[in-house]
């Protein structure tokens, strides 16, 4: 059993700027050397993992960042969140929602109701994403931007190598929230 090729993949600790001219030259050199030695070359389309951010370049634009819906209970007048979805009056039966209705103001709640404001928020920046966040993979424009900054940039730099020298591009785990973004931590879920 032997090795038939390699994936050219950036990893934690990369010194060369990801997708820079130097990076592209290095990738081209590695692919050509693999080919000269009878090995297949494949590219990985991300700086570390998961695929979708182009090393944070995609999510420099806030509209392309991963977002999630969240809520908080309010007991009095409140400042409407920037990404407001709705205000709801809720009656619970233990931990289960018995009834709910959309309301306009906390003053609209009845005696046995609790009031919750729902809104969406963006994933917090993280050093793993070079100071940015994961991408909103449900946003077509974010995905198109990722392809433009990664796949198309590789093709523009050395498209003549695709097929014969570079056999393909590997993409990895295009979704991993909520498991690695605080899901289930104290303060993130309702107490009741």
Task: Please annotate each region the language model reported.
Residues 1-11, 15:
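N-terminal cofactor/phosphate-binding cores enriched in small/glycine residues
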């Amino acid at each position: 059993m032997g090795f038939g090729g390699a994936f050219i993949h950036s990893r934690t600790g990369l010194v060369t700027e990801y997708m820079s001219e130097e990076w592209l030259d290095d990738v081209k050199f590695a692919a050509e050397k693999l080919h000269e030695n009878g090995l297949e070359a494949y590219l990985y389309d991300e700086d570390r993992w998961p695929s979708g951010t182009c090393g944070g370049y995609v999510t420099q634009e806030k509209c392309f960042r991963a977002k999630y819906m969240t809520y908080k209970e309010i007991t009095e007048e409140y400042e409407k969140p920037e990404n407001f979805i709705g205000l709801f009056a809720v009656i619970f039966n233990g931990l289960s929602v018995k009834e709910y209705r959309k309301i306009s103001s906390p003053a609209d709640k009845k005696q046995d109701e609790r009031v919750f404001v729902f809104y969406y928020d963006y994933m917090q920046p993280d050093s793993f994403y070079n100071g940015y966040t994961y991408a909103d993979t449900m946003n077509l424009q974010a995905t198109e931007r990722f392809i433009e900054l990664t796949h198309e940039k590789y093709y523009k730099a050395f498209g003549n190598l695709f097929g014969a020298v570079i056999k393909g591009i590997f993409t990895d785990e295009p979704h991993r929230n909520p498991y690695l973004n605080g899901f289930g931590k104290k303060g993130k879920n309702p107490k009741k």
